[in-house]
Every structure is written in C-alpha cells, then in structure tokens.
Regions:
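Active-site segments that bind and position negatively charged phosphate/pyrophosphate groups
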Residues: 115-226
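A glycine/threonine-rich phosphate-anchoring loop and its flanking beta-alpha core
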Residues: 20-114
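Short alpha-helical scaffolding segments that buttress acidic/His motifs in well-ordered protein cores
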Residues: 90-94, 108, 126-134, 185, ...
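C-terminal charged capping/lid subdomain of soluble metabolic enzymes
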Residues: 85, 91-93, 197-280
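N-terminal small/polar loop signature for handling phosphorylated ligands or for N-terminal nucleophile
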Residues: 1-33
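Solvent-exposed alpha-helices and their adjacent loops that cap or buttress functional pockets
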Residues: 1-2, 25-27, 54-55, 62-66, ...
Length: 280
C-alpha cells in the first residue's frame, strides 16, 4: 500500500475508528473514506476525524485526529441491524438534541416508534440533524482545543461520555456504547441539575426520552469507587498546577442547546448523582 492508495472503512464505529487510525499512521498519513453501516457510526463515529483503538486501561486512549476525505451514509445499510444496535446509535442522536438541537428531542418524544424504524422519514430527519450538529461543531474545533475553563468547544460532543467510558471499561465492553452513554447522560443531567440549574422538567425528560426508545437509564452491578478510578483517565481531565492533582471536567447543560463545563465537582456530589442513576 502506497501513499497514493485509499483505505475504506466499511462497517460500524469500531471499524471506522481502526481504519482511520491506520490511515493516520501508515506512512504518516494516507487517504481514508468511511462507509458507516450502523446508526452510531453514521451519527457520530465516522464523522469528525477522531480515530482510535481501545486498550485494557480504557477506551480510545490510543488514537489520532485524522479527517476522512469522504463519508458515505446510506440508510439502506441499516435495515439488517438488530434492534439493540439501532437503539444504541440513537443515544448519540439524543445527545445531539440535548447539546445543540432540541428539535431532535421533540421529534423523538412525539413518535418514538417512528424513530426506531430506520426506514421512516422521522428517523432520517433526526439522523440528518445529528450529523449536522456533529459536523458543525467539528468544523470549528477539529482538534478539541477551544475548550478552556468553563467554555466548551468540541468537548460538548462528550456529553454523558465521562461516565459512559468508565462503564464500558468496567463492563469489559459488553455494553454497547450508546447504552453506556444513555446512563452517562442521566448522570450528566443530574450533575447539571445540581450545578447548572437544569430544570426538574428536563431532568425527568432525559429519563423519559431514553427509556422510551429502549435505552437503559440505570446501571447495576457497578460500584461508584471502581468507576471513579477509571474516570481519572478521562481525556477531559486536567492537572491542577498548584496541587498536582487530576481534576475532572464534565460537560453539562443549563437547558437543551446551552452547554457549560462543570469543573472539579465535589466528590460527594458525584457519588450522590451516580446513586440516582444506579439500579435499585
């Protein structure tokens, strides 16, 4: 394979991540085209130039920013997906509704069954809107460098992901990403309710929308202390220059479409928020 060749990533998010990583590193960069075949890959993984592989220590800790020269999304490829894969991908679409485009939330609330049908016009609309959200954010902050302090650039796309990645690692990746992200969004909403004044209505709506499309809103069999240790590897964390201690940063929302960063929340508050999204 030469620099004049092209890698084609044809498959789900893991496939496009690996294909992109190979393209970024082989001969210091060759072209790559993605043809995503899952909802999650179309709405998120294949778009935006993030590539990477998972290692035992955590998710996406080895990777690179590397844009494909093209992405082809053909929803006909989704018709053979198991229902679980469709639901998992919808989590990323819901996320885009909370961080940027509340119309997505309204469409899902109005007809959850239509959204679960990948041949429906409603599904195509929410997918298209989610792609537009992701592309819009990435176009101004490809390398995730505009977030500073409480300001949020591309990191807004990680809403719910801090806890989600910890759950995935602890569960040895037996949970789909969207399933973990659904619980992560409930957790992020609880934090937002506590620190950013997110309303009771939106907090409740988070659970209602996610559970309405068959996604989990609680997580069992996991101890907070175990997840908390894994979170120290989160890519949004920073080291406090005065104390040398790693400080966690969470993406939160004041309301749908209005994002803010929650920096160094109280440890007791984190545990309490997780308790509210733990299975009983």
């Amino acid at each position: 394979m030469t620099r004049g060749d092209v890698i084609v990533g044809f498959g789900g998010g893991a496939t496009t991540d690996v294909a992109g990583f190979l393209a970024a590193t082989w001969m210091r960069g060759i072209d790559v085209i993605h043809v995503p075949t899952t909802v999650l890959a179309m709405a998120d993984a294949a778009i935006g130039g993030k590539t990477g592989i998972n290692i035992p220590a955590g998710k996406n800790l080895v990777g690179a920013f590397y844009e494909p020269i093209g992405v082809l999304c053909d929803t006909d490829l989704l018709t053979t997906l198991p229902a679980r894969e469709v639901r998992s991908g919808l989590a990323e679409i819901v996320k885009c509704g909370f961080i940027d485009d509340p119309v997505i939330l309204n469409l899902i609330s109005n007809d959850a069954q239509a959204v679960l049908d990948v041949t429906s016009e409603t599904f195509v609309e929410v997918l298209t809107r989610a792609i537009a959200v992701k592309a819009g954010v990435v176009s101004v902050d490809l390398h995730e460098r505009t977030s500073s302090g409480g300001e949020v650039g591309r990191e807004r796309l990680n809403y719910g992901h801090t806890l989600a990645h910890a759950i995935e690692a602890f569960k040895h990746f037996t949970w789909r990403h969207g399933e973990a992200d659904a619980v992560g969004m409930v957790f992020a909403a609880e934090l937002s309710h506590r620190y950013l004044g997110l309303s009771d209505e939106v907090l409740g709506r988070t659970r209602t929308i996610l559970s309405g499309i068959g996604l989990p809103v609680t997580c069992d069999g996991v101890k907070w202390a175990d997840l908390r240790r894994t979170m120290n590897l989160d890519k949004k964390a920073r080291v406090d220059p005065q104390t040398g201690r790693r400080v966690l940063r969470f993406v939160g929302i004041r309301k749908p479409g209005q994002v803010a960063m929650i920096v160094n929340p109280d440890e007791a508050a984190l545990a309490e928020c997780f308790d509210k999204c733990s299975a009983r």
